[in-house]
Amino acid sequence: MSLKKSPFFELRSGSVDTLLFIVKTADLDALRAELVKRFEATPEFFADDVVAIDVRRLADHERVPLDDIRGMLNDVRMRVIGVVAQPEQHAWAASAGLPLLEARDRRAPSSKAADEAPVQQAEPAAPAAGQAALFEQAGPTLADAGAPPESPAPAVAAQSATLVVDRPLHSGQQIYAKGDLVVLGPVSYGAEVIAEGNIHIYAPLRGRALAGVHGNHDARIFCTCLEPELISIAGIYRTTENPLPADVLGKSVQIRLEQEKLMIEPLRLT
């Protein structure tokens, strides 16, 4: 077989970042009701986004009809690209005809016992323990296509450089940072800033901010004027479906995770 490089196409190993729809119950009625509840107030948030169905939190004896779950997600305009499962779940998970993907999230999904553990009261955030399902940002890895890169990839630095954006972000614009992200202009409604590390916004945040998207639970969001459509850390998110308290709305804040809850706290700058 000739190893000559084709001018028309290449096959290479690669990975794709996507949302995980984490199934935590085999009760389809409860799952459907929770999904409708989440989307009826904010139907456009995940419209046309790709998603993988994650069944790793189901008990060993539990099975779910993946075709039905795919239909539910299609109904809210999400595009299912595959399934994430434990090795012992592969046989039945593959029966739906969806590709089996490997998630590269830093923290493995917690067990049901961990889901049911008591947590301290905090600002309402989605998802909370005990809910039927949640979305997380992760990196399912596509199957090896069989063609290696032309040359070895350089070693990745232990920490990615900070990305600084010194302009306003308008509706439809998206910024992604491999490390921390600093934004010096307003993030308008419909704009989105995403970082694997922390996010600092020295202007109004009116769009979406997603920090720690590969499962970094230590990531934080800092903002000088909080008026967001959505905030998220390590896949745990909150929308303005639940109005923000007066002491943080439009104020300087930091947002962090504490025991799987989003904590939104005023910043004392003086």
UniProtKB/Swiss-Prot annotation:
<dbReference type="InterPro" id="IPR007874">
    <property type="entry name" value="MinC_N"/>
</dbReference>
<dbReference type="GO" id="GO:0000902">
    <property type="term" value="P:cell morphogenesis"/>
</dbReference>
<dbReference type="InterPro" id="IPR013033">
    <property type="entry name" value="MinC"/>
</dbReference>
<comment type="function">
    <text>Cell division inhibitor that blocks the formation of polar Z ring septums. Rapidly oscillates between the poles of the cell to destabilize FtsZ filaments that have formed before they mature into polar Z rings. Prevents FtsZ polymerization.</text>
</comment>
<dbReference type="Pfam" id="PF03775">
    <property type="entry name" value="MinC_C"/>
</dbReference>
<dbReference type="GO" id="GO:0051302">
    <property type="term" value="P:regulation of cell division"/>
</dbReference>
<dbReference type="InterPro" id="IPR005526">
    <property type="entry name" value="Septum_form_inhib_MinC_C"/>
</dbReference>
<dbReference type="Pfam" id="PF05209">
    <property type="entry name" value="MinC_N"/>
</dbReference>
<feature type="region of interest" description="Disordered">
    <location>
        <begin position="105"/>
        <end position="129"/>
    </location>
</feature>
<comment type="similarity">
    <text>Belongs to the MinC family.</text>
</comment>
<dbReference type="InterPro" id="IPR016098">
    <property type="entry name" value="CAP/MinC_C"/>
</dbReference>
<dbReference type="InterPro" id="IPR036145">
    <property type="entry name" value="MinC_C_sf"/>
</dbReference>
<dbReference type="GO" id="GO:0000917">
    <property type="term" value="P:division septum assembly"/>
</dbReference>
<feature type="compositionally biased region" description="Low complexity">
    <location>
        <begin position="116"/>
        <end position="129"/>
    </location>
</feature>
<dbReference type="GO" id="GO:1901891">
    <property type="term" value="P:regulation of cell septum assembly"/>
</dbReference>
<comment type="subunit">
    <text>Interacts with MinD and FtsZ.</text>
</comment>
<keyword id="KW-0131">Cell cycle</keyword>
<protein>
    <recommendedName>
        <fullName>Probable septum site-determining protein MinC</fullName>
    </recommendedName>
</protein>
<keyword id="KW-0717">Septation</keyword>
<keyword id="KW-0132">Cell division</keyword>
